[in-house]
Structure formats: C-alpha cells, structure tokens
C-alpha cells in the first residue's frame, strides 16, 4: 500500500520551488509593511528577569499584566476575548500560529464565526516559537500579520517555560514588551497596571444592540461587560432573541420587558463595576426574572449579594480545568480565563456553591437556593475548549421560558405593553467599542482615571 502511495506522489522539485517562492513572497510582503522579520524585541518583567527575542507583531512598545495560558489551541479566540484586555498573554504551547488566523466572517445571526470580538484584545503576545507559514482552510493571514495589522506587539524566541515558572511562583506581574530598543531599568513609569483602569468601560458596547433568533422563544437582556461572541451565539441558537446593554445600564428599570437577564464575562477587577453591582442588587429586589452570569458576571452577581471577591496568585487560564458540580457529584472539564474568584466563605445563607475547582479548590459557581439564579466562573460556551457544561444554557433558558409562561398566565397583555426599546431600530452588533490601545494611551487612560477619582 505504501509503495503505491509513494509511487503516485508527484515530483517534489516543483512543489519545493513553489513553497520557496511563497516564503519569499511573504517575506517581501513583511518587509514592505515596514516590519522587519527579525527585529530584536525584549520582554521585561517588573523587578524580574529580562528575556530577549524577536519581534513578529507591531513595531510598538506595550506594558500590561503578564499572564499565561496553557491552552493548546484556540489562540484566535483567546486573543480576541475581551477578558484579556490590557494583559500580555504568554502561551505555554511551544509553537503558536501554525493554522494561521481566520477571516472576520459572520454567521446567519450576524455574529463572528471565528473571533470572540471584532478586534485583538490582548495588549501583547509572547511565544516560544511562531509559525511563519500557516495551513488551514479558514486562514487568511499569519499570526504575525494579524498582530501587526491590529497594532499589537509580539515576541518569539524566548524561554516561555522560564517565564511561566516565574509567574507561577511570584504571581501575575507587570511586564513590558519593547521592540528595537533597550529597556531602561530606571523607567519604572513604563509599567502601567491595567488593574487600575476601568477596562470594562473600554470593551462594553456604548449603546444597546439586538440580535434576533430564527425562531424566538423568549427575549433575554444581556449585560455586556465584554461579552464573547459565542456566548451570544449560545443564547440565540437556542431560541433566545437578545438585547445587549452597556455594563452600566439600569437594567432593573426595563427588566419587566424581558424574560431573563444574562451577565457576561469581562476584564479586570470586578470592584470597578459598582454601577453594575448596584443595578443587579436593585434587579433582584424588584424582579423574579431568571439570571445567569458567567466569569466576571459571576463575580458581579456575588458582589451584588454581599459576597467578596479575591485576586488569585496567577489565575486560571486553560481549556482543561476540572470543576466539580456539587449538586450531582459529576466532574466537568471546563474552559477558564480569570484572575479573580469569589470567596465562597462569604456567600450569604440563601446561596450555595454550585461548582468547585478541583485543582485549587476555588469557587467556580454559585446557585440560589429558591430562585432561578445561578452563575459560573468558567465558560460553558467554551470556544475554545470542551462543551461538557454547555447544557447550563439549556437549564437557564428552560427557566426563562417557564418564567415567561408564568408571567403570561397572570398578565396576558404583557407582550402588548409598549416598550421604551424599539428593538427593530437598534444596531445589530456592538456599538462604539475601540480596538486595544497602546502603552502610551493606556498610561493616558490611567492618568485620566486618577484625575477623575
């Protein structure tokens, strides 16, 4: 059999020549873009080691919080996840970029098929080795070309094992990527802490938008703290039309027009979102509407109920983290991306832990004892990652439809009450969200935040 296969193979010389021509063409395109393929770059951890490598992204400098992910695949989804806003993402997988970067194609709902937001969200990218040549039927450009086009610096050729070991032992640290210049150890002001910036304000839609289901069974209000596209898809594909609101929208004032409320993921310190916490508290005081929160949404829901959140030493960022369902005893492999967690010991008496992380015993979810309200720290929509817990969307939407039917039974004219939101006139995608910003703009944003305080 193998003899027949090898005999049928074409001569290699023309193919090799074609590959060489392709490589040369890409190299020349890179040079024409003004991004030298082997320009020196430096990754510096504040009060820590310095690593020298090569730039393969934008020719700019950036600072942020250095965090790491152990995910093997899904780098386009990770890098466009708004939860990574302001962070320099270190990949433990040795080779990144071998299947390229897909297009910004949208599905039948108008949602991005391959990205979690329209722009690259991470402040910087750190890899051991980057694939200059890619191969995948959805790919339209290389990882380096994408980073350069999005204005995000990236560095390869560094010892990511040593970086991750340092971050694991010392905790997530401020770091800096510089391209084409030496780092001055005295420039302490070059390190900007994104945790001091209200990052949710940067990634949340600036005005409501609406996405209709093909066969709508209910209408859900989504609080956008940096929502991932696949979360929206997970709701819409199950028959929920959604109206997405800015993070600080007074949702309790319009909740009676909806069958459920969902609180999304997002970046940064949850205590920055005091407006959201207040509106959620008022929502639970004035409405019995079902509520589901994911990631940052889980933390905000906990804060609204009087619990506290804590910052983890280095966070949980991977696609293979085990979480125990305390109600069934079943273990799920989950996708996670968070640097904060809910302190389960501070949950009020009418709440109980729903999921527990089997690696570090941190809280991964909570559920109300008598009301249809629950939340998870992990991402049941995955993308990338396993779909073990995607059934949670079904549980949530079952409670939403049940609530809707109950409301109609007692208020048969509920659907004819005029709504202040004319959904047909709303935008169909997030409004006014800006691409990730460079180090200088981050510093300016931090200074503005301090001045405003």
Swiss-Prot record:
Complex formation: Heterodimer composed of 2 chains; the small (or glutamine) chain promotes the hydrolysis of glutamine to ammonia, which is used by the large (or ammonia) chain to synthesize carbamoyl phosphate.
GO biological process: 'de novo' pyrimidine nucleobase biosynthetic process; glutamine metabolic process; L-arginine biosynthetic process; pyrimidine nucleotide biosynthetic process
PROSITE patterns the UniProt entry points to: GATASE_TYPE_1
Pathway: Amino-acid biosynthesis; L-arginine biosynthesis; carbamoyl phosphate from bicarbonate: step 1/1
Catalytic site positions: 295, 379, 381
Glutamine amidotransferase type-1 domain sequence ranges: 219-406
Primary location group: mitochondrion
Keyword field contains tRNA-binding: no
Name listed for the protein in its UniProt record: Carbamoyl phosphate synthase arginine-specific small chain
InterPro entries, per database record: CarbamoylP_synth_ssu, CarbamoylP_synth_ssu_N, CarbP_synth_ssu_N_sf, Class_I_gatase-like, CPSase_GATase1, GATASE
GO molecular function, one term: carbamoyl-phosphate synthase (glutamine-hydrolyzing) activity
Superkingdom of the organism of origin: Eukaryota
Record keywords, A-Z: Amino-acid biosynthesis, Arginine biosynthesis, ATP-binding, Glutamine amidotransferase, Ligase, Mitochondrion, Nucleotide-binding, Transit peptide
Organism per entry: Aspergillus niger (strain ATCC MYA-4892 / CBS 513.88 / FGSC A1513)
Transit peptide: 1-28
Family annotation (Gene3D superfamilies): 3.40.50.880, Carbamoyl-phosphate synthase small subunit, N-terminal domain
Annotated function: Small subunit of the arginine-specific carbamoyl phosphate synthase (CPSase). CPSase catalyzes the formation of carbamoyl phosphate from the ammonia moiety of glutamine, carbonate, and phosphate donated by ATP, the first step of the arginine biosynthetic pathway. The small subunit (glutamine amidotransferase) binds and cleaves glutamine to supply the large subunit with the substrate ammonia.
Similarity field: Belongs to the CarA family.
Coiled-coil region list: none
GO cellular component, one term: mitochondrial matrix
Catalytic activity: hydrogencarbonate + L-glutamine + 2 ATP + H2O = carbamoyl phosphate + L-glutamate + 2 ADP + phosphate + 2 H(+)
Record-listed E.C. numbers: 6.3.5.5
Location(s) in or outside the cell: Mitochondrion matrix
